Each structure stands twice: as structure tokens, then as C-alpha cells.
Amino acid sequence: AQAATPAADGKKKISIDTR
């Protein structure tokens, strides 16, 4: 996931990973 912050990146990663 591409994000400016680790928190946002982590949230995106979880969202994509649980897709």
C-alpha cells in the first residue's frame, strides 16, 4: 500500500490483505 504515514499504510495494507 502506498501511504505517506505508517498508520495509513498499515490500514491500507490490512484492507488490501483482507480483500
Swiss-Prot record:
Highest classification ranks of the organism: Bacteria, Pseudomonadati, Thermodesulfobacteriota, Desulfovibrionia, Desulfovibrionales
Location of the protein in the cell: Periplasm
Subunit structure: Heterodimer of a large and a small subunit.
Similarity comment: Belongs to the [NiFe]/[NiFeSe] hydrogenase large subunit family.
GO CC terms, sorted: periplasmic space
Reactions performed catalytically: H2 + A = AH2
Name of the protein in its database record: Periplasmic [NiFeSe] hydrogenase large subunit
Any GO molecular function: hydrogenase (acceptor) activity
Cofactors required: Ni(2+); Fe cation
Keywords: Iron, Metal-binding, Nickel, Oxidoreductase, Periplasm
Record-listed E.C. numbers: 1.12.99.6
